[in-house]
Amino acid sequence: DEFARSLGKKGDSRDIDSYVHKESKDGGVRVLSLLRPLKHPESIRPLLSVLDVAKAGLLEIGALDAPVGEAMGALGCSGISTGRVVIAPRDGEWIDPGQVRVMLDQAGLSEWDIMEDDIDEHETREWLFGVQDELSKSSPDVTSSSLILPVDQHFNVKGVGLVAIGYVQSGSLSKHDEVEVLPASDVGVVRSLQVMDDDVEVAFSGDRVGVALRNLREQSLHRGCMICVPGDGALVGHESSSFDLELAPFQRKELSIGDVVHAASDLQFTVGRVSGLEGSSVVVDWDSPLWIRGDGSSRVLIVQLDAVPMRVMGRASNFQKTG
């Protein structure tokens, strides 16, 4: 928390702490948004939720233990190829940077840097801004894609009404747009939008946005529900799915028929049971619909909660609806 506070102003906090840093430069405003999962390793869901929206990583290491290995494996599975490890040994600990490098390479994080000694928060912020700029240049134009906005939290605000908060994963959202909330299939209208505490007319891909909604039942909102454009087919509901499973780094366990698993994707955490296995091909029947992007761009991690110390089984690819 101390390291994160040095990089940005602490905002809302539940099972994820958020930090924001704004500064003026060249006549404009630059913004960094940082998320820090809490309760890990006791609970893995906050870490997975952060990875659903993260573009780069900062991993502070106080000791080389199983939770660090799990975090590295999850980062590798999520394709977070840009990042830094900050070595900050706990009292009495000594951490070998060479061993950290070996673990990073094994986790698929070979491009990550390792930082030791006193960390300069100004240099770290400049590095993060640089990463942000590079990612914006190299990323495809997701603003022109269909709207996908997973909801992280929601509440009622006096004088405003129902507000949903989440990250715009693709597309854009404007005031007065008609939207649909899945899986409830309820339709409402955007009353107003806030990004970084500022009222805006449009929220774009990558923005953490507060969406005030009217003509919508509060019961239709919950963590992991999706806001999209009615009828555009951006998301497909899966009652059961087949996929290829690429085992996570450091994962020694294999799935068996009947195993209970969770799928983590776009802030969803959907439980299911393995009903078919053939080599690396897996079939899972979901307890409730798992919403997958129609264009095939969903990033899905398969998790087994009792597979400690490495609960991330791996990354699913070639996702197909079987029911």
Where are the regions that the model predicts?
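C-terminal effector modules of nucleic-acid-centric enzymes and ribosome-associated factors
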Residues: D1-I16, A66-P67, C77, S81-I114, ...
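ATP/nucleotide-binding catalytic cores
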Residues: V50-L51, K55, V68-G69, G76
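Well-ordered alpha-helical segments embedded in enzymatic catalytic cores
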Residues: E42-P46, P67-A74
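Residue-level marker of beta-strand positions
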Residues: A56, L173, E178, R208, ...
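Conserved catalytic-core segments of large NTP-driven translation/proteostasis enzymes
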Residues: A107, W112-S220
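Switch I (G2) and immediately adjacent beta-strands of P-loop GTPase domains
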Residues: R5-A63
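Residue-level "contact hotspot" at macromolecular interaction interfaces
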Residues: V50, S172, V202-F204, S220, ...
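Conserved mixed alpha/beta catalytic, RNA-binding, or beta-rich assembly cores of soluble enzyme
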Residues: D26-V29, L38-K39, V202-I227, E254
